[in-house]
Amino acid sequence: LPVVGTRRAYLCGHDEVHSLAKNMDGADVRFWMGFGDHYINVFTVLKNIGLLSEQPVKLADGSEVVPLKVVKACLPDPSSLAPEYEGKTCIGDFVKGTKDGKERTVFIYNVADHKEAFNEVGSQGISYTAGVPPVAAAVLVARGTWDVKRMANVEDLPARPFLELLGDMGLPTRVIDAT
């Protein structure tokens, strides 16, 4: 992957998979996410000892708790971790299709630097990449650029003004040939 290098990726669930598959006829949409070895090790241990379960368990005193809720309660506030985050994110889409009668694959992506994001907004790069796009969308609606007068998913709207505004807001979109 550009900037961050080769990473192991895991197939995950994500909201966008559903709307994209529904709204893009014939699309094969999957969401993959990279995690570091430490995260995977911790996740595996928690899973193996049942702490990721959403099913209540009875304690020795007779009370019941949901293991996953206990884990969530014990985790630090994610914003408290932001000052120590280092490195960069790379979030993108591999898009396969046909253009001008030729098969083509492109990788469309953006990169956020954790330290730069923290210096700008007091949060880490993942939150930055999650927060800037909805703000850009709101600006386009407020300006009347996106004025469809109905509920719509982003993929239903003209992409160019959105991608240009993301760049203006500090989250430029890059496209490389991945054929």
Give a label for each model feature:
Residues 1-179:
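C-terminal catalytic/substrate-binding lobe primarily of soluble NAD(P)-dependent oxidoreductases
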